[in-house]
Amino acid sequence: MTLVEAAVETIEEALAAKRAGADRIELCANLGVGGTTPSAGLIASVVQQVGHPVFVMIRPRGGDFVYAADELDAMLEDIDRARPLGIAGIVTGALRSDGSIDVESMRLLMSPAAGLPVTFHRAFDVVANRTEALEHVIDLGASRVLTSGGAATALDGAVAIAMLVDQAGERVSIMAGGKIREQNARDVIARTGVREVHARLENEASIRGLVRVLHGS
């Protein structure tokens, strides 16, 4: 069975994702720019009302993934505030200006999250060298990488995703994301070998259809 993670912005969307059968929730603000950190109040409400594993986006703004010291301070504060609220994990990522993983910043961010699973988000799709970047993410101890293979969609990036799955082995989970729908999900899985997929909740039916295809029910 392939795990389905639904990206949501509101309590209503989180509840809809749960009803639709999603296995995990990624809670964000501003999904139009790829997601930013949601408020502590929203995090608490979703965790309390949904009763599903909730991963929280830690990202101070849209745009690139190269962060100044004050932005990193804000991200650390957000992790400190989110952790006691019962979250299941965090979703984050930081790059250097040369397109490599910012290992120092990632270590800093992962320190207060110790014990929580960490997803390295789609900042991975703009790294200069995916093979090298994946090894850095593995060495950091992240639980999974969310990627479209550097393409506009997971289907378009299927070859690259499959290569990452092979490289990762059992060391880290590769989660495919990028316009995965009920209509193309089986093709994405067959071409990549991923065991987890990530999809934006467009409506309850969109996730329900995806779950039906991937859970076989």
Give short role names for the model-derived ranges.
Residues V4-V8, I25-L27, V54-I58, I90-T92, ...:
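Hydrophobic faces of well-ordered beta-strands that scaffold small-molecule active sites
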Residues E9-A20, V66-R81, V118, D125-L140, ...:
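Catalytic cores of alpha/beta
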Residues G35-G62, S100-A123, D156-E182, I207-S217:
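Alpha-helix-loop-beta-strand connector modules within alpha/beta enzyme cores
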Residues I11-E13, R24, T37, I43-V103:
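Active-site beta->alpha loop and helix N-cap motifs at the rims of alpha/beta catalytic domains
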Residues I25-T36, R81-S97, L140-G157, T192-L210:
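Glycine-rich phosphate-binding active-site loops on the catalytic face of alpha/beta enzymes
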Residues M1-I25, N30-V33:
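N-terminal pre-domain/capping segments
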